[in-house]
Amino acid sequence: EFGVSADYILGLTEKKENENKGNVHIDYNPQNKEVVRIPMLLMSSSFQLGKCLEFIESIEDVPQKEMAYAEYYYFSGQHEKAVKYSEMYLNHEDIMLKLSASLIYTFANLSLDRINSARIGLNRLREYLEKAMSMEIDKKTRACCVFVASAAHTLLHLPVGNIPPLSEYLNEFTKGMQLWGAYVLAHKTYLNKEYERSLGIVQACIMTSDKIYPIAFIYLNLVAAMDCMNMMEKEKAKEYFMKAWEISKPDDLIEGIGEHHGLLQGLIETCMKKEHPDDYARIIDITYKFSAGWRRIHNPDTNEDVADNLTTTEFTIAMLANRGWTNKEIAEHLDITTRTVKQHLTCVFSKLNITNRKQLKDFMLR
């Protein structure tokens, strides 16, 4: 069990803003001169599609604005700029800015293959979580530490310390942060192979949101596509993937698509390679960069051996074969011949030094 109330999953939980007047409300209001910051503001915000930069410019608090730019540069695949903006706030006195900075700094440096720098950011997140759980601090600050640590843990599939259940803190979050929290829960449920349940979380959150939260919605639709692929519902998977693409395209927020390549099991290829060749090439470039850096941390830290010597096409075919797809099903899904599938699998087996499909599981994503 998630420990999440039915009201939350159905989007009925609202923050009781008139209660606990002594506690600070952590929403952001551009008209409010007394700004109280939250981590990952852009990721958790609602804004009009195609107006991301205008939204960032409307933020009056300069540090929060600069961190929002760091988020934008990261989610649009501009990793050097993301590092430049985020590293300015790694040692800031405001914990909310430090949390955002450490998360962006970690992920952006992975894609730049700066593993030592990525480890610095990851270690900062572990330190903040440990302090948050051991010190007497307000619940909202602790909740935000858990929020960021959970995001890093889920997206990287790496240990980030002893993280308490995110569900215990959901009511402390703004609506956008709750949606991101739902993505984390759905992703964890996906990893537990409870695909229908994971999809249900996504559907409930999207249906009950009266605004669009672009970055959160991109990631929610991606995990829904992953769920559908594992239930062999290919057409529905394509619909969710294309929804993620439609949301990401106006502001060029393509990083998340590239990061999820392996888990999307060929959807990027089938939906984008012919129709959007230039965007496809950029997304695959993100995939290669992120995957290479991620494996350099993930494999030694988890004692797992996710394959690092396969092309994106080979990895996709290997993932599908590992999930039980026949050569014919793989060929139809990727619009290639069964002979081509067999040729790719022969290359995969040779590179991984294995002899059959059953051995693939040791080298694939979960």
Predicted regions and their residues:
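Helix-turn-helix DNA-binding segment
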Residues: 295-346, 350-355, 361-366
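Short, charged recognition helix plus adjacent turn
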Residues: 11-31
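Helix-turn-helix repeat elements of alpha-solenoid scaffolds
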Residues: 35-53, 71-87, 111-128, 151-167, ...
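DNA major-groove recognition helix of helix-turn-helix/homeodomain DNA-binding modules
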Residues: 1-8
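Solenoid-like repeat scaffolds
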Residues: 53-62, 87-98, 123-139, 164-178, ...
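TPR/TPR-like alpha-solenoid signature
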Residues: 67, 102-105, 146-147, 182-184, ...
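Linker/hinge segments immediately adjacent to helix-turn-helix/homeobox DNA-binding domains
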Residues: 151, 161, 177-217, 221-312, ...
